[in-house]
Amino acid sequence: AGLEHLTPLLAEGGVVAKGKVVIGTVSGDLHDIGKNLVAIMLKGAGFEVVDLGKDISPQAFVDAAVKEKAGFIGMSALLTTTMPVMKDVVALARKNELLRKVKIVIGGAPVSEEYAREIGADLYAFDAASAVDRVRAAADR
C-alpha cells in the first residue's frame, strides 16, 4: 500500500529507456516488497520494466523475456526453499537461443554473490540500489 507513495519519490522522470527488464519473484515465494522497490528504482533509472509479479514459474520468466525481447531477467527470493527455482530459470534461459545475450540478475535476503556464480547468473544485487547500479553498468557495456 505504501509503495504507490514511494514511486514518485524514487523515480527520476523523463528518462529515455536504457533497456528492458523482466522481473518477478520466483515460484513458491510470495514476498514481493523488495522486488517492487527494485522495479520502481529501475523505472526511475530509465529502464522499461515488465513486472511479472510473484510466484512466477521458470517457464513464465523465459516466455516473458522472449516475448518482450528483454535485455535482463531479474529474480527475487526471500525463502531459501525457493532459491533452487532461480537455478531452474537460469538453466532454461541458457537453453533458449533467443536469450543468448540476456543478463540474469538475482537478489533477495538469502541470496549471495557466491550463489549467483554457482547457478550461472550474470549479476547479483544485495539491495535495490545495487540492482540498479549493476543493471545500469551491464547495460552500458
Predicted regions mapped to residue ranges:
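Domain-level signal for soluble alpha/beta catalytic cores
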Residues: 1-72, 77-106, 110-118, 122-141
